[in-house]
Amino acid sequence: MIVQAILAILITHYCISLYRRSKLRHIPTLGYSWPLLSYITAFKYEKHGFKLVEEGYRKFPNKVWKIRTLDEQAGDGWYIIANGTQSVEDISKAPNDQLSSTIFFGSDITTNPYHVNVVRLGMKKNIVLQYHEMYREIRDTLEDSLKLTSTGDGEAQSEKTCPFSRLLTCLPPPSEWVTLPLSQTILEACARVYARLVVGHPHSENPEYTRIFAGAVKHILEGKNLRVYPKFLRPFISRVSIKTHGDIQRLADLIEPLLKAIKREEKKHNGDDWPEKPRNILSWTLDEARRSGVSELPCDIAKRLYLTALSLEGISRTVALALYELSIRPASVYLNDIREEVRTVIEEVARFSPAPNQDALKLYEEQRGWEKIAIDMMHKLDSFVKEVLRYHDNQPVHLGSRVLKDFVFSDGTFIPAGSTLFVNSRGAHMDEELLENADTFNGFRYFKEQDQDQPRALAEQVGARDPLTRTAFAYYTFGYGKHACPGRFTASYIIKTMLARILTDYDFELTESTQVYAETHRFPDESAMEMRFRKKVEE
């Protein structure tokens, strides 16, 4: 009986797969397409996804094609991938009720993804105010994370690996080096910055926020592995093996008194804004929840904050890989030029900054020259970061969308509702017709020397080049068009400010144990990267 039941399930699954595949039969396939044989391709995609996506880009130029994956959350495991600029344009113009990128986050999130408005409106609208908070936390975080002071007993701790959790107890004198696990150190630093943007200072000093937000990256990514399991098993496996539920509950406990305080003040001021109202992500999330008519409970708001923390993975990874790329080459190639640009821009902005009133004098002295406009003027740094994002993109496809209603590309290709659609970013990023020497890292690829001839007035310098936040047909890291990532502006300022401060204040180098892949398109083992830091020695 058991064997018969298993056979019945397999036959039923096979028949359903045949039916669903028939709806996609008109779309060309890379690899096997028959239900059982297609799993061979699916396992190959798990291990060699980049190579297969590049092969599909060459085999089906400017066309739409499909490949079988183990992602059962997709339309029966099939990814439909679009090649070429016209396909990207078609997708970018599709309305949200036809193509939805939020459908992957679960029903309670996707029914009303109001947290997107928090990023798009609250954070972007208040970017100048947020930048001041961001800068101060980055400065303080780096001083704590890379704080090169004496250990108290006078003994140098150089050339020893120092775990982030024990950093303050094993630090060397200023002239010595401290070795850190690069990826984890930068991730925890970014989590501290995000915590300050969420709840503000001094609440963000609670280390629980850093632990939760840094852990969110790991746990949400672990949750993606659930896609290979049948739908009915996912809730059980999630409860047993994924720690997101406990972290979200702990985050809810932390923000509950802060939400109550906001509501008390609102009641006192008859619902109107008041001068001391927090200007942070938590407050904006509460406002958006009300406007959307959804739950204001701490656990529901905590879910949104936790989900948004997933962006820390890309932010911290970019900072770490930028330091890696700077370290594997002589300083004369990129490091010296970018350091000089940072120094020059900060001095220039400080010179042009208006004199503050007495109340703002302390902030002015602390932050002299470190303004949002200064980061906008660091064009070599911007180009370098943009190239890191392109060259080290860890996703072969972008602009993932669930097709909610039947969709037709401009060339007539029909995509049925229920399908999962992506854009072939890897193919475009490596296309020699779009980018010269695309398989080679060129940190100043997006930097144009002729812009140096423009007048030096600050306002005319801003936006003089093609910044990393501007999407293009050959650059899909942040998406494209109206489906582009709304948080890319905040992410950009965190990445560039953190790098600029490190370049200004610290010397750094990779340890001998870190494997280097210079001039070859191979990703380093990010979990094993170690880097030495010391207070910058002036020459």
Segments the model singles out, each with a brief description of its role:
Residues 10, 413, 521-539:
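C-terminal helix/juxtamembrane-tail motif
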Residues 3-111:
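N-terminal membrane-proximal hinge/A-helix region immediately C-terminal to the signal-anchor transmembrane segment
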Residues 470-471, 477, 482, 488-524:
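Cytochrome P450 heme-binding "Cys pocket" and the immediately downstream C-terminal segment
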Residues 46-54, 348-411, 432, 465:
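Conserved cytochrome P450 K-helix E-x-x-R motif and the immediately C-terminal K′/meander segment
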Residues 134-319, 336-337:
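Cytochrome P450 heme-thiolate monooxygenase catalytic core
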